[in-house]
Amino acid sequence: MFVKSLMMGKESIITVSPKDNIRKALDIIKKENLLSVPVVYEDKFYGSISKDKIYEYYFEECPNKESYLEDFIVEKVMKTDVPEIFPMSQVEEAANYLVTYRTPFIAVVDRDDKFLGILTHKAIFNENIDVLGLNKGKRLSVIAYDIKGQISKLSKIISENGGDIISFVVIDPKVKTDVKEIVVRVRANDFDAIVEKVKEAGFRIS
């Protein structure tokens, strides 16, 4: 899936400019109940500013606390190492950036470095819920030996017994083992009958 499918376009995003004062940024963050706000000016992305960053600077670095909110500007406090990504990049790449940089969002820009919008953790999380069908069908968790043909065999059993496979995920156990956990979301009139057929085929239900 491409980033452009999940991104939030700039038209629906509240931003601040590098020259805005800290009070304006903080007021927006509080009013809109946001974690952070993109810093943008004339379609160029500069970074982000968050409540945490504002307070951190105030308590640890600010030389004049009395005039901080009014006189200090966003570019003094903003985070500048926010990753950027192209709209036609894969969502998996974007997800890796979000985890690696520990940022609430990544900026989406075009080849001319023009700001197009943002992609958030929430957007990716919600898409995963939809793709995995977590609100649909029933969950079947199967322990299978890590040998060729197991997935095909399991799929055939489910299909031949009236099951409609919504999603199919093989979970990596993160340790060296000869078995894998396969989680299947199934829609069926007789789910219990499918479970019994899976057991009869030698699979273990977890």
Region locations from a protein language model:
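Cytosolic beta-strand hydrophobic patch enriched in CBS
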Residues: 16-18, 35-49, 85-86, 104-119
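Tandem CBS (Bateman) regulatory domains
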Residues: 1-12, 50-86, 90-100, 111, ...
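OB-fold/S1-family RNA-binding modules
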Residues: 29
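A short, glycine/Asx- and small/polar-enriched loop/turn
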Residues: 176-182
